[in-house]
C-alpha cells in the first residue's frame, strides 16, 4: 500500500492480485490493478475534486461514492470553468467512465441539469453509470430542509437547502 498526502486529503494506492487456472494445475500470476482513492480528512473544501480531476486524465473509471448536491467542486479545464455537485470529475475525459455509487444522495433533476450544463459548454456527452442502489433525494427532502431553515429564522444551521440534512 502506498500513501501520499496532499494537504488534508489522502490518496491511497491499493494493489490487488489474483491467480488463474490453467487446466488442472493452478498457477499463480501477479497482476497489478491500481486503485487510487481520494479521501478527505475534513468536512470538505480540501481539494478532493481538484486532485480527482488531475488523476482523471490517467484513469479509466472515476467513482463518486457518497455525498450529494449540497457540496461542490470547481474544475477549470480547456472547456471552461465548471462547478460540479453530483457528477464526478471524470466526466471531462472521453476515455473515462464516471460512476455514481450507492452512497450518493442523488437528486435526479440536479444530475440532468449538470449533464446538460457541461454538454452545452462543449464537453462531449460523458459515459455515466448510476448504481441501482443509489438513494434518491425526493422533493419533500428539499422542502423539509427549506422549512427548517425558515423555522430557525436567523439561527439557521447553514443548510444549502438542497435536502441533504433531512435525507440523511
Language-model features: locations:
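Short, positively charged and aromatic/hydrophobic N-terminal segments
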Residues: 2, 6, 10-22, 30
Amino acid at each position: 500500500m502506498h500513501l501520499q498526502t496532499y494537504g488534508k486529503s489522502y490518496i491511497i494506492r491499493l494493489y490487488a492480485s489474483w491467480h488463474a487456472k490453467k487446466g488442472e494445475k493452478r498457477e499463480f500470476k501477479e497482476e497489478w490493478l491500481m486503485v487510487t482513492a481520494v479521501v478527505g480528512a475534513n468536512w470538505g473544501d480540501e481539494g478532493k475534486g481538484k486532485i480527482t480531476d488531475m488523476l482523471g486524465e490517467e484513469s479509466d473509471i472515476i467513482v463518486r461514492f457518497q455525498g450529494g448536491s449540497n457540496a461542490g467542486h470547481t474544475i477549470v479545464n480547456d472547456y471552461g470553468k465548471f462547478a460540479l455537485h453530483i457528477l464526478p470529475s471524470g466526466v471531462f475525459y472521453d476515455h473515462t467512465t464516471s460512476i455514481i455509487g450507492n452512497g450518493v444522495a442523488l437528486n435526479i433533476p440536479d444530475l440532468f441539469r449538470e449533464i446538460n450544463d457541461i454538454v452545452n459548454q462543449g464537453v462531449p456527452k460523458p459515459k455515466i453509470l448510476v448504481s441501482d442502489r443509489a438513494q434518491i433525494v425526493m422533493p419533500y427532502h428539499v422542502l423539509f430542509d427549506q422549512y427548517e431553515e425558515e423555522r430557525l429564522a436567523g439561527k439557521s444551521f447553514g443548510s444549502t437547502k438542497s435536502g441533504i440534512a433531512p435525507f440523511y
